[in-house]
Protein backbone atom coordinates (compact mmCIF):
# COMPACT_ATOMS: atom_id res chain seq x y z
CA UNK A 1 0.00 0.00 0.00
CA UNK A 2 2.76 2.43 0.96
CA UNK A 3 4.64 1.56 -2.24
CA UNK A 4 1.59 2.38 -4.39
CA UNK A 5 1.12 5.72 -2.64
CA UNK A 6 4.80 6.64 -3.04
CA UNK A 7 4.74 5.70 -6.75
CA UNK A 8 1.59 7.77 -7.28
CA UNK A 9 3.11 10.81 -5.58
CA UNK A 10 6.35 10.36 -7.57
CA UNK A 11 4.41 10.28 -10.86
CA UNK A 12 2.59 13.48 -9.89
CA UNK A 13 5.91 15.15 -9.09
CA UNK A 14 7.43 14.14 -12.43
CA UNK A 15 4.33 15.24 -14.38
CA UNK A 16 4.17 18.64 -12.68
CA UNK A 17 7.90 19.20 -13.18
CA UNK A 18 7.67 18.34 -16.88
CA UNK A 19 4.62 20.55 -17.43
CA UNK A 20 6.23 23.39 -15.53
CA UNK A 21 9.42 23.13 -17.56
CA UNK A 22 7.44 23.27 -20.83
CA UNK A 23 5.37 26.31 -19.87
CA UNK A 24 8.46 28.15 -18.62
CA UNK A 25 10.77 27.32 -21.52
CA UNK A 26 12.38 30.45 -22.85
CA UNK A 27 10.86 32.71 -20.18
CA UNK A 28 12.24 31.40 -16.90
CA UNK A 29 15.84 30.76 -15.90
CA UNK A 30 15.89 27.64 -13.73
CA UNK A 31 18.20 27.66 -10.74
CA UNK A 32 19.13 25.66 -7.65
CA UNK A 33 18.26 27.06 -4.25
CA UNK A 34 18.26 26.49 -0.50
CA UNK A 35 15.43 26.89 1.99
CA UNK A 36 16.35 26.86 5.69
CA UNK A 37 14.30 27.59 8.77
CA UNK A 38 12.83 26.63 12.10
CA UNK A 39 9.48 25.44 13.38
CA UNK A 40 7.45 24.84 16.51
CA UNK A 41 6.33 21.19 16.62
CA UNK A 42 3.77 19.17 18.60
CA UNK A 43 3.37 15.39 18.24
CA UNK A 44 0.75 12.78 19.18
CA UNK A 45 2.55 12.12 22.47
CA UNK A 46 1.58 15.67 23.55
CA UNK A 47 5.22 16.72 23.49
CA UNK A 48 6.21 20.19 22.28
CA UNK A 49 9.48 20.93 20.60
CA UNK A 50 11.47 23.01 18.16
CA UNK A 51 12.86 21.87 14.84
CA UNK A 52 15.33 23.04 12.22
CA UNK A 53 15.01 22.12 8.58
CA UNK A 54 16.90 22.49 5.32
CA UNK A 55 15.75 21.88 1.75
CA UNK A 56 17.94 21.95 -1.35
CA UNK A 57 16.59 21.60 -4.86
CA UNK A 58 15.74 23.16 -8.20
CA UNK A 59 13.24 25.87 -9.04
CA UNK A 60 11.83 24.66 -12.36
CA UNK A 61 9.48 27.61 -12.88
CA UNK A 62 7.60 30.29 -10.98
CA UNK A 63 5.26 27.46 -9.97
CA UNK A 64 7.21 24.25 -9.24
CA UNK A 65 10.12 23.54 -6.89
CA UNK A 66 11.48 20.01 -6.40
CA UNK A 67 14.15 19.15 -3.86
CA UNK A 68 15.37 17.03 -0.97
CA UNK A 69 14.72 17.95 2.65
CA UNK A 70 16.22 17.00 6.01
CA UNK A 71 16.07 18.24 9.56
CA UNK A 72 15.91 17.54 13.29
CA UNK A 73 12.93 18.05 15.60
CA UNK A 74 13.78 18.12 19.31
CA UNK A 75 11.16 17.38 21.99
CA UNK A 76 11.08 17.34 25.77
CA UNK A 77 9.62 13.86 25.65
CA UNK A 78 9.01 13.30 29.35
CA UNK A 79 7.88 16.14 31.57
CA UNK A 80 9.18 14.50 34.76
CA UNK A 81 12.00 15.87 36.85
CA UNK A 82 14.99 14.18 38.43
CA UNK A 83 15.72 14.87 42.10
CA UNK A 84 18.91 14.61 44.09
CA UNK A 85 18.98 14.52 47.91
CA UNK A 86 22.19 15.69 49.60
CA UNK A 87 22.77 15.03 53.31
CA UNK A 88 25.50 17.00 55.08
CA UNK A 89 27.51 15.97 58.15
CA UNK A 90 24.89 17.38 60.53
CA UNK A 91 22.10 15.33 58.97
CA UNK A 92 20.51 18.24 57.14
CA UNK A 93 19.06 17.29 53.78
CA UNK A 94 18.92 19.39 50.64
CA UNK A 95 16.70 18.32 47.75
CA UNK A 96 17.73 19.53 44.29
CA UNK A 97 15.07 19.33 41.58
CA UNK A 98 16.47 19.34 38.08
CA UNK A 99 14.78 20.14 34.74
CA UNK A 100 13.15 17.53 32.49
CA UNK A 101 15.69 14.88 31.67
CA UNK A 102 14.41 12.98 28.66
CA UNK A 103 14.78 14.35 25.15
CA UNK A 104 13.64 13.03 21.80
CA UNK A 105 15.13 13.72 18.36
CA UNK A 106 13.06 13.09 15.23
CA UNK A 107 15.20 13.04 12.07
CA UNK A 108 13.32 13.16 8.72
CA UNK A 109 14.77 12.83 5.20
CA UNK A 110 12.39 13.28 2.28
CA UNK A 111 11.69 14.33 -1.31
CA UNK A 112 9.97 17.71 -1.33
CA UNK A 113 7.58 19.16 -3.92
CA UNK A 114 6.34 22.75 -3.59
CA UNK A 115 3.76 24.27 -5.92
CA UNK A 116 2.87 27.97 -5.93
CA UNK A 117 -0.82 28.69 -6.46
CA UNK A 118 -0.07 31.80 -8.54
CA UNK A 119 2.78 33.55 -10.33
CA UNK A 120 2.72 36.58 -8.03
CA UNK A 121 5.85 37.61 -6.13
CA UNK A 122 4.28 36.57 -2.81
CA UNK A 123 2.06 33.55 -3.56
CA UNK A 124 0.34 30.98 -1.42
CA UNK A 125 1.82 27.51 -1.88
CA UNK A 126 1.25 23.83 -1.17
CA UNK A 127 3.87 21.23 -0.31
CA UNK A 128 4.09 17.42 -0.46
CA UNK A 129 6.75 15.29 1.25
CA UNK A 130 7.63 11.60 0.87
CA UNK A 131 10.53 9.92 2.67
CA UNK A 132 11.44 8.39 5.99
CA UNK A 133 12.18 9.37 9.59
CA UNK A 134 13.71 7.88 12.73
CA UNK A 135 13.31 8.88 16.38
CA UNK A 136 16.15 8.69 18.89
CA UNK A 137 15.67 9.26 22.63
CA UNK A 138 18.32 10.55 25.01
CA UNK A 139 17.72 9.91 28.72
CA UNK A 140 19.87 11.91 31.12
CA UNK A 141 19.69 11.02 34.80
CA UNK A 142 21.62 13.45 36.97
CA UNK A 143 21.94 12.35 40.56
CA UNK A 144 24.63 10.78 42.70
CA UNK A 145 25.78 9.02 39.54
CA UNK A 146 25.12 10.75 36.22
CA UNK A 147 24.10 8.53 33.31
CA UNK A 148 23.29 9.14 29.65
CA UNK A 149 21.45 6.53 27.61
CA UNK A 150 20.76 6.80 23.87
CA UNK A 151 17.96 4.63 22.44
CA UNK A 152 16.56 4.20 18.93
CA UNK A 153 12.82 4.43 19.57
CA UNK A 154 11.66 3.67 16.02
CA UNK A 155 10.79 5.16 12.66
CA UNK A 156 9.07 4.53 9.38
CA UNK A 157 7.76 5.93 6.11
CA UNK A 158 7.07 9.67 6.17
CA UNK A 159 4.30 11.31 4.16
CA UNK A 160 3.40 14.93 4.74
CA UNK A 161 1.59 17.96 3.41
CA UNK A 162 1.92 21.67 4.11
CA UNK A 163 0.40 24.97 3.06
CA UNK A 164 1.73 28.45 3.51
CA UNK A 165 2.44 31.92 2.21
CA UNK A 166 5.63 33.30 0.65
CA UNK A 167 6.80 36.89 1.08
CA UNK A 168 9.23 38.27 -1.52
CA UNK A 169 12.17 40.31 -0.21
CA UNK A 170 13.83 43.23 -1.97
CA UNK A 171 17.05 41.26 -2.55
CA UNK A 172 15.21 38.53 -4.50
CA UNK A 173 15.10 36.06 -1.60
CA UNK A 174 11.93 35.16 0.27
CA UNK A 175 10.40 34.25 3.61
CA UNK A 176 7.78 31.50 3.91
CA UNK A 177 5.33 30.89 6.76
CA UNK A 178 3.70 27.45 6.73
CA UNK A 179 1.61 24.89 8.61
CA UNK A 180 2.79 21.30 8.16
CA UNK A 181 1.27 17.91 9.06
CA UNK A 182 3.35 14.73 8.72
CA UNK A 183 2.44 11.08 9.19
CA UNK A 184 5.20 8.61 10.08
CA UNK A 185 4.30 4.92 10.14
CA UNK A 186 6.53 1.91 10.81
CA UNK A 187 6.05 -1.71 11.92
CA UNK A 188 6.13 -0.74 15.62
CA UNK A 189 6.04 3.04 15.41
CA UNK A 190 3.56 5.84 14.65
CA UNK A 191 3.84 9.59 15.00
CA UNK A 192 1.98 12.59 13.59
CA UNK A 193 4.00 15.78 14.19
CA UNK A 194 2.24 19.07 13.42
CA UNK A 195 4.44 22.13 12.96
CA UNK A 196 4.14 25.87 12.43
CA UNK A 197 7.30 27.30 10.94
CA UNK A 198 9.17 29.89 8.95
CA UNK A 199 11.77 29.38 6.20
CA UNK A 200 14.22 31.63 4.38
CA UNK A 201 14.70 30.84 0.70
CA UNK A 202 17.74 31.93 -1.28
For the regions a language model picked out, list residue spans one by one:
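Internal, hydrophobic beta-strand segments that form the core of beta-sheet-rich folds
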Residues: 179-180
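Short, exposed beta-strand-loop hairpins at the edges of beta-sheets
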Residues: 183-188
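Gram-negative (and chloroplast) outer-membrane scaffold detector with strong preference
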Residues: 32, 37-42, 50-145, 156-159, ...
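N-terminal glycine-/serine-/threonine-rich phosphate-binding loop
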Residues: 46
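Outer-membrane beta-barrel "beta-signal"
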Residues: 113, 190-202
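Cleavable N-terminal export/targeting peptides
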Residues: 1-31
Amino acid sequence: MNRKIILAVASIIVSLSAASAQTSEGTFQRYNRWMVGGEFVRNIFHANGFGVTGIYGRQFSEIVFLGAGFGVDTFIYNGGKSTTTITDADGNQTVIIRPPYRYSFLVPVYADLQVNFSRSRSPFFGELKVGGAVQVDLERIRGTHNTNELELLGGGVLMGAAAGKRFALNNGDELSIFLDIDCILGPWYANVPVSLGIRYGF
